[in-house]
Amino acid sequence: MRVFIQRSKRHHIKFTKTRYTIPGAAVLTQRHGLGNYGTVDLDWIGYADDLVLAFDDIENLSKGLVLLNTTLTDYGMQVNVGKTKTMILNCKEENYPSTIVDLENVSIENVKVFQYLGSYIHFNQANTGDEEINMRIDSAECKFYEMGKKLMNYKISLSTRVMMLNSLVRSRLTYACQTWTLNSRQMERICSTYFGMLRKMIRNGYKRERDTYRYVYSNQRLQEIAKTEHPCSFINRQQRSFVAHIVRRDDKCILKKALFNADEVHIPGRTPSLWKNVTGRENCSEIEFIRKAIAKDF
């Protein structure tokens, strides 16, 4: 990719830029205390051979895709046209186009939803989309019923079964939760799924009080019996540790710049922000959170 980026500069291909403002308390270089701000090119995002390129217009997208394929060809590789997809984020057109670019006379599919590294991305949902939550729930439930003979076997101690649940099922339910920006409805679905599994594992978990629809065991009581962590608490803890880790990273780190994103948002309503969500839950100011993160108090 280093060769591709160098060639992109020579061909004047422009990638998407994003603004950032790192608070002074989080600046770890010699400019500590002065703040750090600017723009950064999102020239590429990738893991192994799974690459993401971001452009502001179709012209640069087309040039970048052709140049990427040319660069790979020079090294005995090529772009897999069948697996390559495009997506228009926040598309304002009423009719979402099925394709917007070609490569070697083959149309590249333009999708509304794409799965990248196990997570679903939706073209017009700035926060964690419902497709991602549906996928997480389906994945967790499939694993739960796959192991149902063990997880719902009362002859096995509950503590052992809960440990198996958290290790093999909850890990699927909360996969990549460190970067989630959920609304209250989505969080309730995650919690409901987890407690529904606990009810199946605990004897008389679905028993109701006489003449009412109320369960004998509330969710809180289920948690006490199982001696496990509430899913909301688990997700919050994961996000707090992740954000604190990013705060301690070098100021040049792209993750740190993305965490303190300062792009203008023109969409009405509350702007989803992992940084604001985490600091808001800790009941402390952003500066206090940064100081605790640097001191590794989290």
Predicted regions and their residues:
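Short linear motifs embedded in intrinsically disordered, charge-biased segments
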Residues: 3-298
